């Protein structure tokens, strides 16, 4: 894969998760769409969203329960995209949702690799590729960040050190 393919793939998945078009992430204006459940969305997402904001730098795409469209629209149009994802700006969004009995909950940042920067690194551990039968006994609390017992049918490949 090259850098262009990586960002296109990420935008396509984000578009599926949010219920928008991949091109929405490169527009010059913010976009608001109604959040819906999509069977091709990431399996751990609880859809539809009340409010989910995503930016690849140009703008913000907001996938929302339309009851809260005005709150979100006012918020994302008040600040530059990068400032919508940091405090103290997020306190304003939190305050608006708190009036409806909700609070800002999860904040995540994902970083896409630059292919020209990737190099194989030495590893002092033996790596083992495992398949479902190999890791069926590893659904334990200490591995819950990697394996999910609630969706174990989706776990098909694992690399362990």
Walk through the language-model features, giving the residues of each.
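Acyl-donor-binding surface of acyltransferase catalytic domains
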Residues: 9-134
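A mid-sequence, solvent-exposed acidic-amphipathic segment
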Residues: 134-161
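Extracellular glycan-recognition regions
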Residues: 2-7
């Amino acid at each position: 894969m090259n850098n262009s393919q990586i960002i296109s793939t990420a935008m396509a998945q984000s578009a599926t998760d949010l219920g928008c078009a991949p091109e929405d992430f490169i527009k010059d204006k913010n976009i608001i769409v109604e959040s819906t459940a999509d069977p091709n969305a990431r399996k751990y997402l609880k859809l539809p969203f009340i409010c989910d904001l995503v930016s690849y730098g140009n703008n913000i795409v907001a996938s929302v329960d339309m009851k809260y469209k005005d709150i979100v629209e006012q918020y994302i149009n008040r600040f530059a995209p990068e400032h919508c994802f940091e405090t103290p700006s997020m306190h304003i969004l939190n305050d608006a949702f708190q009036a409806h009995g909700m609070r800002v909950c999860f904040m995540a940042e994902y970083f896409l690799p630059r292919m020209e920067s990737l190099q194989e690194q030495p590893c002092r551990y033996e790596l083992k590729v495992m398949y479902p039968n190999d890791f069926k006994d590893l659904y334990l609390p200490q591995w819950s960040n990697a394996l999910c017992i609630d969706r174990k049918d989706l776990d098909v490949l694992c690399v362990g050190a």
